[in-house]
Amino acid sequence: KDMILGPAINIQRIPTGGRTYEYLSEDPLLSGELAVNYTLGAQDHQEAVCLKHYALNNQENMRGFVDVKVSERAMREIYLAPFEAAVKKANAYGVMAAYNKVSGEWCSENDRLLNKILRGEWGFKGIVISDWGGTHSTTKAALGGLDVEMPNDRYFGKALLDSVQAGVVS
């Protein structure tokens, strides 16, 4: 199956952000509805989508290092809402983990975001891929919910095989 690396459905929070033009809206409801319809349209034509950048990746400056601190309410009602809508209403096939940290955990190995919320609460059945070079570990990422490391196999190649064979990852 071919996969579109999009749509990018982060909230347009910073007007001067380098990738704000990619995001659908500053309004979480509108972003969610647009993401749902984009996903349905693409996947109805046998093209998988990969919703990005999950989650709270709303600025370019220091995006690979920033540790986002946000209230539970703001996170759920603003920043996660478009992702939740596209997962629940359109069964998005893929999600791309963002570069940043959320509450001290890299998005690519964030058990709460990937396993508990995305898969647990929302019922996501697809694959989670890292942003390019956005994987930071083997065991923590594998157990934290990441399925595919992009664009190489630094952590999910031999290191992952060794972890599986050692019984650290199952």
What are these language model-derived features?
Residues 1-170:
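Glycoside hydrolase catalytic-domain context in secreted enzymes
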